[in-house]
Swiss-Prot record:
It catalyses: [HPr protein]-L-serine + ATP = [HPr protein]-O-phospho-L-serine + ADP + H(+); [HPr protein]-O-phospho-L-serine + phosphate + H(+) = [HPr protein]-L-serine + diphosphate. Pfam families: Hpr_kinase_C, Hpr_kinase_N. This is HPr kinase/phosphorylase. GO terms for biological process: regulation of carbohydrate metabolic process. GO terms for molecular function: ATP binding; magnesium ion binding; phosphorelay sensor kinase activity; protein serine/threonine kinase activity; protein serine/threonine/tyrosine kinase activity. The active site is at 136, 157, 175 (proton acceptor), 240. Its EC number is 2.7.11.-, 2.7.4.-. It comes from the Bacteria. Catalyzes the ATP- as well as the pyrophosphate-dependent phosphorylation of a specific serine residue in HPr, a phosphocarrier protein of the phosphoenolpyruvate-dependent sugar phosphotransferase system (PTS). HprK/P also catalyzes the pyrophosphate-producing, inorganic phosphate-dependent dephosphorylation (phosphorolysis) of seryl-phosphorylated HPr (P-Ser-HPr). InterPro entries: HPr(Ser)_kin/Pase (IPR003755), Hpr_kin/Pase_C (IPR011104), Hpr_kin/Pase_Hpr_N (IPR011126), P-loop_NTPase (IPR027417), Ser_kin/Pase_Hpr-like_N_sf (IPR028979). Belongs to the HPrK/P family. Residues 261-266 are annotated as: Important for the catalytic mechanism of dephosphorylation.
Length: 307
């Protein structure tokens, strides 16, 4: 999903020096500092990127003679450039303005330091253009681990989230989870309308931050584990050792999935806490509980064989 120049101007409070064509889309999240291009090197040039002139490029132009500066800028603007942004509030060279006007291109200016501006705009564009989807579920932060709780309606996802909030964990979103894939990570957040709200059957919608404080909610969280609730089946084939890993694909990213059978009497919130703690343990340890049991069994068998 692209971003228009007008949207960029509004979100970054950019000063408009030269107005270009309306509704020009920005379709890539990378930016380019055209130092090499101003020196005359255009191999591998990406004109579709936002072009950013900072102190270094500005000083390079400043040291040129007016005729050379005009020549280099006319060449630069002969490409199909979406917009040019000058940082640090630097003065605009007259040759640059004239060349931009010929092509009806956007020239914008920011007071921010170049490196900080590039970092912010790259993150902004990556977020805006990231592939996204919406899933039904509840996203919570448990011990710093983003856990997406899924399952059919009425199975107890929201009630479990409420219990987790009472135990000091944090809610990201209930019912609808907006997910974006950014650099291989899945970032989940709440739709703006339902942010901070939790629907509990029999009670209705509650404002989590009002009842439990602002520390009980989060704007977004990276999804690490999927906890899928399903009704208990006596003949169900459930993983009892934790050796059969299951994954679910979301936007091309595989996420570990745990199936949790639900029946009266099970403390699901405690199980989810244990799953989060176990995830952290597995990330930090080279040995699993199953490996420990196998080692103990071998040691026990060796002792018995010596008797």
């Amino acid at each position: 999903m692209g971003v228009t120049i007008e949207k960029l101007i509004k979100d970054f409070s950019l000063e408009v020096i030269q107005i270009g064509e309306e509704n020009v889309p920005i379709n890539v999240s990378d930016v380019n500092r055209p130092g090499l291009q101003l020196a005359g090197f255009y191999n591998y040039f990406a004109p579709e990127r936002i072009q950013v002139i900072g102190k270094a490029e500005w000083s390079f132009l400043e040291d040129m003679s007016p005729d050379l500066r005009k020549k280099r800028l006319n060449k630069f603007f002969s490409f199909d450039i979406s917009c040019l942004i000058i940082t640090r509030g630097l003065e605009i060279h007259e040759e640059l303005l004239k060349a931009a006007r010929k092509r009806n291109l956007w020239i914008l200016r920011s007071d921010m330091v170049t490196t900080k501006f590039i970092s912010k705009i790259t993150m902004y564009l990556s977020d805006k253009m990231a592939p996204e989807t919406r899933l039904h579920g509840v996203l919570v932060d448990v011990y710093g681990i983003g856990m997406l709780i899924t399952g059919e309606s009425g199975i107890g996802k929201s009630e479990t989230a409420l219990e987790l909030i009472k135990r000091g964990h944090r809610l990201v979103t209930d019912d609808a989870v907006d997910i974006k894939e950014i650099d291989g990570d899945l970032i989940g957040r709440s739709p703006e309308i339902t942010f901070g709200m939790l629907e509990v059957r029999g009670m209705g919608i509650i404002d989590v931050s009002a009842l439990y404080g602002l520390s009980s909610i989060l704007n977004s969280k990276q999804i690490k584990i999927i906890i899928h609730f399903e009704h208990w089946k006596d003949d169900g084939d459930y993983d009892r050792l934790g050796v059969n890993d299951e994954y679910q694909d979301i936007l091309g990213v595989k996420v570990k999935k745990l199936r949790v059978p639900i029946r009266p009497g099970r403390n699901i919130a405690v199980i989810i806490e244990a799953a989060a703690a176990n995830y952290r343990y597995q990330r930090m340890s080279d040995i699993s509980p199953v490996d420990i049991i196998e080692k103990r069994m071998l040691e026990s068998m060796e002792k018995e064989s010596k008797i």
